[in-house]
């Protein structure tokens, strides 16, 4: 299968476009997804938005999954907390993929048996907007559904980086968020966000380039008790360069519940 997808990139607040041609990559993913060759319906010849998909399905028996966006392979073998298109092989790797504006569908198939549909996610995409599509649910055989966040990816101020947080962890509950230098004393730290509820986005802070540790504690934890109460902690694996943007996601354990964890998505 040879599929051409028009990818949109932001420039000065507008979408520019450049064409990426998938040859071996598309053929490999199509075979893994068990799909038929078909004309690519995702070439944005009209108004387009951008999306990325994140697997937060808390049912190990249904993971990993293949994601099929509007009939076109979008990701294969996506384990818990993995995302696409970030995990696609080069040259298809990207932070987001372009898709025509309007109502769209992502079908999730079990990688080990692509005759099994894990979930069908219906989303609505507005032109010139970025979205993260989280596949959620699955614990105890429950249904898999979509939770959509609108991602504001305006240019980061010169010489700064942006760090935002999304709470997708029922086990973590409502939290206070601390964004500090690694191993900084939480007793004297000022929270970047307080009372961040489940399925809520903290739009972020802009800080100097460097490495950061993002920690959460149950909302209202007194300063002296914060270090012992940390329920998620993520340290950026490398220093974030100027102009970069990251989203830290709080999530439950792979089968649901505790212990919660956190991981990083690259925005810019």
Predicted regions and their residues:
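Sec-dependent bacterial lipoprotein signal peptides
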Residues: 1-32
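Intrinsically disordered, low-complexity polar regions and short flexible loop motifs
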Residues: 33-268
């Amino acid at each position: 299968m040879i599929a051409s997808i028009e990818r949109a990139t932001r420039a000065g607040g507008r979408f520019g476009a450049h064409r990426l041609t998938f040859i071996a990559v598309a053929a490999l993913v199509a075979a893994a997804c068990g799909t038929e060759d078909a004309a690519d319906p995702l070439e944005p010849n009209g108004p387009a938005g951008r999306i990325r998909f994140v697997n937060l399905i808390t049912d190990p028996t249904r993971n990993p999954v293949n994601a099929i966006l509007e009939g076109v392979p979008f990701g294969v073998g996506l384990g818990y907390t993995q995302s696409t298109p970030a995990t696609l092989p080069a040259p298809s790797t990207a932070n987001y993929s372009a898709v025509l504006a309007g109502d769209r569908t992502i079908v999730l198939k079990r990688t080990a048996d692509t005759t099994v549909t894990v979930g069908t996610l219906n989303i609505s995409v507005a032109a010139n907007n970025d979205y993260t599509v989280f596949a959620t649910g699955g614990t105890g055989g429950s249904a898999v559904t979509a939770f959509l966040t609108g991602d504001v990816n305006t240019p980061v101020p010169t010489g700064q980086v942006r760090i935002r947080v999304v709470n997708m962890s029922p086990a973590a509950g409502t939290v206070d968020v601390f964004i500090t230098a690694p191993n900084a004393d939480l007793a004297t730290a000022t929270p970047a966000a307080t009372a961040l509820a489940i399925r809520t986005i903290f739009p972020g802070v802009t800080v100097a380039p460097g490495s950061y540790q993002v920690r959460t504690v149950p909302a209202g934890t007194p300063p002296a008790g914060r270090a012992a109460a940390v329920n998620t902690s993520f340290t950026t694996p490398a220093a974030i360069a100027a102009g970069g943007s990251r989203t830290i996601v709080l999530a439950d354990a792979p089968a649901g519940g505790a212990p919660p964890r956190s991981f990083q998505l690259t925005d810019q």
